[in-house]
Amino acid sequence: MSASNIHFEMAERSQALNYGGIGAIHLMGQRLGLAQEIDGRLQLLKRHLPYHESDHVLNLAYNALLDGQRLEDIELRRNDEAFLDGLGAQRIPDPTTSGDFTRRFNEDSVLTLMEAINATRQRVWEKQPGDFLWHAFIDMDGTLAGTFGECKGGMALSYKGIWGYAPLIITLANTREVLYLVNRPGNAVSHEGCVPWIDRAIELVRPRAAEITLRGDTDFTLSAELDRWDSQGIKFIFGMDAHPKVVQLAESLPETAWKALERLPRYEIATEPRCKPQRIKEAIVRFKGYLNKKLVGESVAEFSYQPHKCGRSYRLVVVRKNVSVQKGEMVLLEDIKYFFYITNHTDYCAEQIVALANERCDQENVIEQLKNGVNAMRMPVDDLLSNWAYMVMSALAWNLKAWYGLLMPNRERGLELLRMEFRRFLHLIVMLPAQIVRSGRRIIYRIMGYNDWLKDFFATWEYLRRMAPA
């Protein structure tokens, strides 16, 4: 990099933008009937001059898709003539108008918006292979969304001492789509009010899934609901607190009931195995004589257990971890920890139940992307309901990413796109420099850059172009 004689000049007037992939995303939404679904269900505006409800919703979703960090970033797009021409828009709502739109929502209208998005989602699922969602995994968890605001309505102080909200997130693990988002005060526990939303998620995927499994941590082991879900044919794998009764039952098992738990490697080595690097942290901990807990071994067993509010017993899979407590080079004691998983699955062995339960941890990655990828949990507006609406509209950007991957003709590349972080998706698919040319009735995006996903981008665009509108 030796360039030093650098000058800047104004170019001749031309229309270009650095996120040409937005045209393909917009075309996908049109073919799926997303805007029509929103406008047909959501009635918040008395007069649709100059905007419809879908214009406001897509404006916030596209702001996230164009790497917008704040509501104020919408102003950049309002003044971008190439962006407006690329979407065939005369104008888009400004940040203040977008914030005002979120304050029009009540709980029913937020639900209506989510159902409009889910109706569009069903059209994506209809175009998938026959074995798609043969076994659907619905994951659920709560998280904290802090805010520095002093006047945010509905916020509360969480158990961590953070002011803000405590959203409930229900996702489909197979595609990493967000099915439902529920905003709650910051002092809400993870499972608070979750049952109706779990039931809605079940009804959403039931027409497509031959089998449904619910997964959650110990907070979601709702013993009053397990029998009902079991009678409906719904499977579940939930963590369970290691309270004294189940610990005593685990300790009373004969040693022959336990067998070593072998963890499968996370990936296969394609070339030759390499030497593992030295663990610098552990070396420092030993040298300094700090307290160090090291896993020595794991074993697994199972027994039947009937929770207090259940009318029948279920499998309780228990993992016993042998932890060596060390200080420097000296072993202080051997500590035994128990982890429990309750399930009504009968066709999986104990090791497979543990593996499936641990796979739910991938939902933490989805939550991270919602927080810092699409920035859906910044809570920038007035109160609990308006921030809930903002959260749903911004999270639509994450679902648009998933739908684009599901509609990609190259199935392998599409599944790879589902696993991508949001920022990588933006750089590979959305942030394609393009010149905007209006020719007759056509809007032409002339791509001016290249990456190794461009072949798949054009194949997907051709597929979307030929797709019959909903």
What does each model-found stretch correspond to?
Residues 1-188, 194-207, 229, 405, ...:
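Dynamic "connector" segments at or just before major functional cores
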Residues 2-11, 235-366, 372, 459-470:
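An anionic, glycine-rich sequence signature occurring as long contiguous blocks
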Residues 15-16, 46-55, 331, 381-390, ...:
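Structural motif
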Residues 59-60, 74, 92-94, 98, ...:
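Short, conserved catalytic/metal-binding motifs centered on acidic residues
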Residues 70-73, 147-149, 178-180, 224, ...:
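Short helix/loop capping segments that flank catalytic or ligand/cofactor-binding pockets
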Residues 74, 350-384, 388-389, 393, ...:
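Short amphipathic alpha-helical "interface-anchor" segments enriched in bulky aromatics
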Residues 190-245:
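Domain-level cores of phosphate- or acyl-group-handling catalytic modules
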Residues 399-446:
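C-terminal structured "cap/appendage" subdomains that terminate the fold
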